Amino acid sequence: MRLAVLCSGNGSNFENIVRVCDQDQVVLMIHNKKECGAARRADKLGIPHCHIKMKDEDTIIQLLQAWRVDLVVLAGWMRVISADFIKAFPRTIINVHPSLLPKHKGLHAVQQAIDSNESHTGCSVHYVTEELDSGEVICQSREIAIRPDDTVETLTRSIQKEEHRILPLAIEHVKHEIQTRTYRHLLSDEDN
């Protein structure tokens, strides 16, 4: 299966995917911030990457199609993608989110968990739909205790450890689903 990973920041989830999943699976990484850690990691790992501004979403779609990408992984992609993007890749875009969905959707999920005096949080991997952080959940992490002295930074580090654990599991799950869906499609074509 051919993966593309979209990143905006440090790229630790991207690097983890490359290292844990078969290396030849990640064929491309796209980042929307020119000087980000993800680009440096891609250089170090020998993964092709390019910087594309999010307003150039059509270019991103065309590039993903040209690279024959089977699965798009949003790993720290800090932009909402459009309905057209989602329609171009139906049920083949997944996102890792730093909360136990459906709690704390959106950009500041870790801060929301702290502010709401939750005793625990975690992370989720879900299919991307037009409604923000509302797609079917593929898997969730173990609960992570929120300590009284936790800050957004310390809690984010704890959550990222779990993201590194569950994102490859979610990719394997989706890979199996895509293969099953393709096999069923081939069988139905043969029946006609």
Please give the residue ranges for each predicted region.
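One-carbon transfer enzymes
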Residues: 1-192
